């Protein structure tokens, strides 16, 4: 289920736009995740006290963590599927420490696509959305494989 060179170009073109304000995009992604799937908020001790969108928008910690999440994802996307070295420590921490299910990775993938569509509609048409969907599915599938190696069925 690899991506073609053209698909990777579409993914990385829009990702370049994300990187111009990675913390802002990350904050928007996490807020979207928490609003559409409130159960995911329980996995974040640091944020579970945030009940409203205004509280989330005002949280410097949430904005910072959003940047961390998207920076890690960006380093994986830039490897165009050759991301073993970047993926292994991320999978290990998410499997053994944070216990983040693959379902939650699906939810954040949906949030990422929604935020990119709303912020960059001119650069994120149907082809780019499909390519990003494939890239995020590749990421999730590889995370699931690593989870099993760490004994987490996630």
Curated annotation (Swiss-Prot):
Domain Globin, chain residue ranges per copy: 2-148
GO molecular function, one term: nitrite reductase activity
SUPFAM superfamilies: Globin-like
GO cellular component, one term: sarcoplasm
Domain of life the protein comes from: Eukaryota
Gene3D superfamilies according to UniProt: 6.10.140.2100, 6.10.140.2110
Residues with PTM Phosphoserine: 4
Reactions listed under catalytic activity: Fe(III)-heme b-[protein] + nitric oxide + H2O = Fe(II)-heme b-[protein] + nitrite + 2 H(+); H2O2 + AH2 = A + 2 H2O
Residues reported in the UniProt entry to bind heme b: 94
Example GO biological process: removal of superoxide radicals
InterPro entries associated with the record: Globin, Globin-like_sf, Myoglobin
Keyword Disulfide bond: no
Signal peptide region: none
Subcellular location: Cytoplasm, Sarcoplasm
Assigned keywords, A-Z: Cytoplasm, Heme, Iron, Metal-binding, Muscle protein, Oxidoreductase, Oxygen transport, Phosphoprotein, Transport
Binding site for nitrite: 65
E.C. number: 1.7.-.-, 1.11.1.-
Parts forming coiled coils: none
Residue numbers binding O2: 65
Function according to Swiss-Prot or TrEMBL: Monomeric heme protein which primary function is to store oxygen and facilitate its diffusion within muscle tissues. Reversibly binds oxygen through a pentacoordinated heme iron and enables its timely and efficient release as needed during periods of heightened demand. Depending on the oxidative conditions of tissues and cells, and in addition to its ability to bind oxygen, it also has a nitrite reductase activity whereby it regulates the production of bioactive nitric oxide.
Family: Belongs to the globin family.
Protein name, as recorded: Myoglobin
Gene designation: MB
């Amino acid at each position: 289920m690899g991506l073609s060179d053209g698909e990777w170009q579409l993914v990385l073109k829009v990702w370049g736009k994300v990187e111009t304000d990675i913390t802002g995009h990350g904050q928007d992604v996490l807020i979207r995740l928490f609003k559409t799937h409130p159960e995911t908020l329980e996995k974040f001790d640091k944020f579970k006290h945030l009940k409203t969108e205004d509280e989330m928008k005002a949280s410097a910690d949430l904005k910072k963590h959003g940047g961390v999440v998207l920076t890690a994802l960006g380093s994986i996307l830039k490897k165009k599927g050759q991301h073993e070295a970047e993926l292994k420590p991320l999978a290990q921490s998410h499997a053994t420490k944070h216990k983040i299910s693959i379902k939650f990775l699906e939810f954040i993938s949906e949030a990422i696509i929604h935020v990119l569509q709303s912020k960059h509609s001119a650069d994120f048409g149907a082809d780019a959305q499909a390519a990003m969907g494939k890239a995020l599915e590749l990421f999730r599938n590889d995370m699931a494989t690593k989870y099993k190696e760490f004994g987490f069925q996630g």
